[in-house]
Amino acid sequence: MVDSNTQYPETGALAPAPADSLLISNVLVYGEGEPTNVFVKDGVIAAIGGTHEADRTIDGNGGVLLPGFVDMHVHLREPGREDTETIATGSAAAAKGGFTAVFTMANTTPVMDQPVIAESVWFKGQNIGLCDVHPVGSITKGLEGKELTEFGMMARSEAKVRMFSDDGKCVDDPQVMRRALEYAKGMDVLIAQHAEDHRLTEGASAHEGENAARLGLRGWPRVAEESIVVRDAIMARDYGNRVHICHASTEGTVELLRWAKSQGIPITAEVTPHHLTLTDERLETYDAVNKVNPPLRESRDAEALKKALLDGTIDVVATDHAPHGSEDKCCEFENAKPGMLGLETSLSIIVDTFVATGLADWRFVARVMSERPAEITRLPGQGRPIAEGEPANLAIVDPGKTWTASGADFASKAENTPFEGQEFSAKVTHTVLRGKVTCADGVAQNA
């Protein structure tokens, strides 16, 4: 449960909540107890239970009410690649997926290494109003791995940047990474590392294993990730600042994270739905929709990641939502760009993998998709308990809604989902952002 007394740095200026009331009826809070009503007034939960008159009403139809989800890792491609995604289409995809806040990575064109770029993204997200879009600043200027971005200016900007990452590239120079951790410590911002020693992955396009060897694909070894994870864990230990590992993908990374946490090192990690559920067996078709960075690994890696998420060794689920146009995916596997869509399938995958199988309950879903991401990013107002006086950032899930994934039906501009044609047994039906309904009956609402 989130500590109500924790004080986090403020965000950029938020769009005002609706000055009216909303009644969410017939929902199971955290999937527990009997169906109840939740009354929202001026963007805040005013009452749980009872009968209330309201300006607007949502019939939850016995669905599960959870805190709105927070995604620490998305690529909304704006500015620079609006042909594949925009803040508007990405926000709509987020709303459909139950997300009330996302963190969009810095590998844009131009790179998100200046306050004016971050502020533009923040303000545009607030004007669209479907999801809080938090810009992630780059660790180094131009993602070149040499000179640090001005963390202080970014953190003090109107976007209030609180996370920095060169995601897509690794900060592989240890001196640069050391300076980044030391600089970040003074202003309590988070450093998120894309763990990849590029000297070990040059020219690689698939997990280094039997399948890649048989198919003639250059292999991407586990050690390329694990060597950076252990280095950065030791740096976090010695220099005392938090470090977050993006998209953990190997069994060895899990072991290293477990060791680091046992030593009290301030390290956190995320895992994607695709690394939890897909393996390199999908390489057989040479379909580039399965190309991703880091690559899909083996079944033993996926199993280790599941166990690590269950026991808290891995803290959160993050989608690494990465839209690409068909020209970047419908080509030779080696030449295709890595990345997969994730915002509109994440909840369904986590429910089918953990809740439907009896491995976890709905509180677990709230923890890994809402509470912990908000805690790690020091994000006020998100990941909060469903309780009176808390912001009404909420998602309703129909746990019995069977649906089939189709990229053509997604709100995202792109269609590169590896789950095309897969049937799921749960779906987000409604999303509420500070009392504003951003998704209704599975449809993103116009701003």
Curated annotation (Swiss-Prot):
Co-factor binding comment: Binds 2 Zn(2+) ions per subunit.
Reactions catalysed according to its record: (S)-dihydroorotate + H2O = N-carbamoyl-L-aspartate + H(+)
Recorded GO MF terms: allantoinase activity; dihydroorotase activity; zinc ion binding
Keyword Membrane among UniProt keywords: no
Pathway(s) annotated for this protein in UniProt: Pyrimidine metabolism; UMP biosynthesis via de novo pathway; (S)-dihydroorotate from bicarbonate: step 3/3
Signal peptide residue numbers: none
Active site residues according to the UniProt entry: D320
UniProt-annotated binding residues for substrate: H75, L76, R77, N107, N293, H324, P338, G339
Keyword field contains Aminoacyl-tRNA synthetase: no
Pfam families: Amidohydro_1
Binding sites annotated in the UniProt record for Zn(2+) 1: H73, H75, D167, D320
UniProt keyword annotations, A-Z: Hydrolase, Metal-binding, Pyrimidine biosynthesis, Zinc
EC code(s) of this entry: 3.5.2.3
Binding site for Zn(2+) 2: D167, H194, H247
Function as written in the Swiss-Prot or TrEMBL entry: Catalyzes the reversible cyclization of carbamoyl aspartate to dihydroorotate.
Name listed for the protein in its UniProt record: Dihydroorotase
